[in-house]
């Protein structure tokens, strides 16, 4: 670990440059269009024009298949985790770690390569919190799986996990930076699921195995 990265007052310029570099890397990692590529390469389709219009793993599952959806899910998880772990490797503060993670989320939701239309940040957010505070990340995943096993609705599971995230972070004693970013990430996921929430309220949201 580089000592000056823990003491910005000692040498501010390297800290700023390192932070900006990691933010750029985080965004580029997040914007890697794994779901879009799976649709193009395997089915010759543009996921933005299919189903929910998302490039995430759920839309891949519905329109491409289970195997590709699993691969896309793992890649998307890795994008969020890697962005945070790079910041940790360079010894950056909690606040800069969470900014790197948020950059990955932003890249996933608004990828420059796809006209700013990407996924819904669930898998990438999961990876981000595995990197920041893995017990909280695993707890959210457990909550997600519990809801999906009962109701078989991915969006409902995502919404419940997003709501539970900041609560779990507070209970776990996470730092102020981690608590704040858990709330921000939760709001980002909920905002991306606003159409799903409308369908959930109307009772028209499809279950696993049904077309959107």
Curated annotation (Swiss-Prot):
Disulfide bond entries: none
Membrane topology according to the record: Multi-pass membrane protein
Transmembrane segments: 9-29, 67-87, 95-115, 128-148, 168-190
Single GO BP term: phospholipid biosynthetic process
Gene Ontology MF annotations: acyl-phosphate glycerol-3-phosphate acyltransferase activity
Location in or out of the cell: Cell inner membrane
This protein's UniProt keywords: Cell inner membrane, Cell membrane, Lipid biosynthesis, Lipid metabolism, Membrane, Phospholipid biosynthesis, Phospholipid metabolism, Transferase, Transmembrane, Transmembrane helix
UniProt superkingdom: Bacteria
Signal peptide annotation: none
Pathway where this protein functions: Lipid metabolism; phospholipid metabolism
Keyword Transferase: yes
Gene Ontology CC terms, in alphabetical order: plasma membrane
Role, per record: Catalyzes the transfer of an acyl group from acyl-phosphate (acyl-PO(4)) to glycerol-3-phosphate (G3P) to form lysophosphatidic acid (LPA). This enzyme utilizes acyl-phosphate as fatty acyl donor, but not acyl-CoA or acyl-ACP.
Assembly behavior: Probably interacts with PlsX.
NCBIfam families given in the database record: glycerol-3-phosphate 1-O-acyltransferase PlsY
Name the UniProt record assigns to this protein: Glycerol-3-phosphate acyltransferase
Species the sequence originates in: Parasynechococcus marenigrum (strain WH8102)
Lineage: Bacteria, Bacillati, Cyanobacteriota, Cyanophyceae, Synechococcales
């Amino acid at each position: 670990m580089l000592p000056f990265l823990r003491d910005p007052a000692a040498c501010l310029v390297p800290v700023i440059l390192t932070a900006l570099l990691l933010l750029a890397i985080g965004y580029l990692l997040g914007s890697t269009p794994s779901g879009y590529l799976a649709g193009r390469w395997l089915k010759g389709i543009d996921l933005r024009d299919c189903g929910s219009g998302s490039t995430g793993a759920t839309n891949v599952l519905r329109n491409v298949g289970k195997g590709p959806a699993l691969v896309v899910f793992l890649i998307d998880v890795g994008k969020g985790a890697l962005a945070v772990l790079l910041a940790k490797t360079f010894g950056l503060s909690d606040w800069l770690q969470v900014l790197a993670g948020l950059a990955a989320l932003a890249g996933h939701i608004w990828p420059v390569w796809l006209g700013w239309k990407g996924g819904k940040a669930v898998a990438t957010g999961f990876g981000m919190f595995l990197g920041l505070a893995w017990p909280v990340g695993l707890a959210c995943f457990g909550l997600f799986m519990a809801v999906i096993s009962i109701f078989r609705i991915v969006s409902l599971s995502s919404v419940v996990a997003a709501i539970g995230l900041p609560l779990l972070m507070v209970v776990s004693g996470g730092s102020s930076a981690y608590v704040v970013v858990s709330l921000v990430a939760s709001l980002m996921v909920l905002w991306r699921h606003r159409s799903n929430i409308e369908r959930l309220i109307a009772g028209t949201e499809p279950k696993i195995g049904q077309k959107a």
